[in-house]
């Protein structure tokens, strides 16, 4: 049986890892073993943070909406409740964009929410 020489494959594997690790500091971009370990961590972090990014953006949007709503005299909770009662279906991403870039439109939405809250019956304490 013929002998299998793996030099080409091994070199290719090492070169691939070192290319992926270019830009890292010190040994992590120059030594194969350190670069491989760093790449394992990097891939784990990127996988985790792609999922965490969604929650981070939602948190940012809610913070922006809350700040703009409070500037107009409503809390975030009451504002969203009023929008739901009035049947306005605008997501938080768009609301945050309006709060930052179009204050007049956001103020109009606050007035719609305020009117819906005023028209809704107050919940009674049980």
Swiss-Prot record:
Molecular functions per Gene Ontology: rRNA binding; structural constituent of ribosome
Example of a GO cellular component annotation carried by this entry: ribosome
A Gene Ontology biological process term: translation
SUPFAM superfamilies reported in the protein's UniProt record: Ribosomal protein L20
InterPro entries recorded: Ribosomal_bL20 (IPR005813), RIBOSOMAL_L20_CS (IPR049946), Ribosomal_protein_bL20_C (IPR035566)
Keyword Manganese: no
Keywords: Ribonucleoprotein, Ribosomal protein, RNA-binding, rRNA-binding
Family the UniProt entry places it in: Belongs to the bacterial ribosomal protein bL20 family.
Entry-linked PANTHER family: 39S RIBOSOMAL PROTEIN L20 (PTHR10986)
Protein function: Binds directly to 23S ribosomal RNA and is necessary for the in vitro assembly process of the 50S ribosomal subunit. It is not involved in the protein synthesizing functions of that subunit.
Protein name (record): Large ribosomal subunit protein bL20
Organism of this sequence: Frankia alni (strain DSM 45986 / CECT 9034 / ACN14a)
């Amino acid at each position: 049986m013929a002998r299998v020489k793996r030099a080409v494959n091994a070199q290719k594997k090492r070169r691939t890892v070192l290319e992926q690790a270019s830009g890292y500091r010190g040994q992590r971009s120059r030594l194969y073993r350190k670069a491989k370990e760093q790449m394992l961590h990097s891939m784990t972090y990127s996988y985790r943070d792609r999922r965490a990014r969604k929650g981070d953006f939602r948190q940012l949007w809610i913070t922006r909406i809350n700040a703009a709503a409070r500037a107009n005299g409503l809390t975030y909770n009451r504002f969203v409740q009023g929008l739901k009662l009035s049947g306005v279906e605008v997501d938080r991403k768009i609301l945050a964009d309006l709060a930052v870039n179009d204050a007049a439109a956001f103020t109009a939405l606050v007035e719609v929410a305020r009117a819906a809250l005023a028209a809704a019956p107050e919940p009674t304490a049980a």
